[in-house]
Amino acid sequence: MPELPEVETLKNSLKDKLIGLIIENVELKRDNLRYKLSPLLTTEILNTNILDVRRRAKYLIIDFNNDYSLIVHLGMSGRFTLQSANYKTQKHDHVIFDLSNGEKLIFNDTRRFGMIYSFKTDLLEKEFFNDLGIEPFSDLLTLEYLKDKLQTKKIPIKNLIMDNRVIVGIGNIYASESLHLARIHPDKSGNDLRDDEIENLIKAIRDVLTKAITAGGTTLKDFVNGDNKPGYFTKQLKVYGREGQSCLSCSSTIIKIKHSGRSTFYCKTCQYS
């Protein structure tokens, strides 16, 4: 599933190309994605100017000049790409937005776990994103904030940093990578972390996410940006997907365990604490 770096990459690839354009037509090829698409989607943003393209957590947001926003979640296999005017519709193209410059914005999703909504812009944080935690790059992510969230939690730290009510945008890949960089065992209980470990973890999360964004995200199978290009952070992964291989820091063997049904990768030597 695309995480923060992939959605940030998607935003960066689309923003300058979309701002100022108008949605001239919306075609719903299939309305039963993860949730049924509202027929209002074809009218609420029609003939409106795109003001901004931004990200919140793992959601892409397109703001329009009529005070509505389009919210897109890629799910497991979603792709949201710009295509030329002569683009031929593909099998899993579910929503097609015709743009005023002749191009098309296509939402394609093989597994249909993606979501698209239209929502009043000024109500997004209060009603749509009301359960979300803070952004990893926010100044609000401090030792005090994370310590407060962890002090009563007797669950593995990996589960905690993947909790979108605490910190948004961190999924399986970047949780494993961040904990390896911070040298923290993924099974360590959140309330057992020392202050210096929490500070190291915050720094590691930001460092890993920054490098991933710079590399265009991680493409394991489906992810591409708005220009239909894959991400290359896969080549920089230190532990994720490397079970049985040598740790790139110490040459010990990378181990895979399960957390809540998800695969977790770590180095028993580097991540001893």
From Swiss-Prot:
Protein name in UniProt: Formamidopyrimidine-DNA glycosylase
Q: What is the primary gene name for this protein?
A: mutM
Catalytic residues at: 2-3, 58, 262
State the EC number(s).
Answer: 3.2.2.23, 4.2.99.18
List, alphabetically, the CDD domains matched. EcFpg-like_N
Point out which parts of the chain are FPG-type zinc fingers, as ranges: 238-272
Cofactor(s) listed = Zn(2+)
| Keywords recorded for this protein, A-Z | DNA damage, DNA repair, DNA-binding, Glycosidase, Hydrolase, Lyase, Metal-binding, Multifunctional enzyme, Zinc, Zinc-finger
Question: Subunit info?
Answer: Monomer.
Chemical reaction(s) catalysed? Hydrolysis of DNA containing ring-opened 7-methylguanine residues, releasing 2,6-diamino-4-hydroxy-5-(N-methyl)formamidopyrimidine; 2'-deoxyribonucleotide-(2'-deoxyribose 5'-phosphate)-2'-deoxyribonucleotide-DNA = a 3'-end 2'-deoxyribonucleotide-(2,3-dehydro-2,3-deoxyribose 5'-phosphate)-DNA + a 5'-end 5'-phospho-2'-deoxyribonucleoside-DNA + H(+)
InterPro entries xref list: DNA_glyclase/AP_lyase_DNA-bd, DNA_glyclase_Znf_dom_DNA_BS, Formamido-pyr_DNA_Glyclase, FPG_cat, MutM-like_N-ter, Ribosomal_uS13-like_H2TH, Znf_DNA_glyclase/AP_lyase, Znf_FPG/IleRS
Q: Quick check: keyword DNA repair in the entry? A: yes
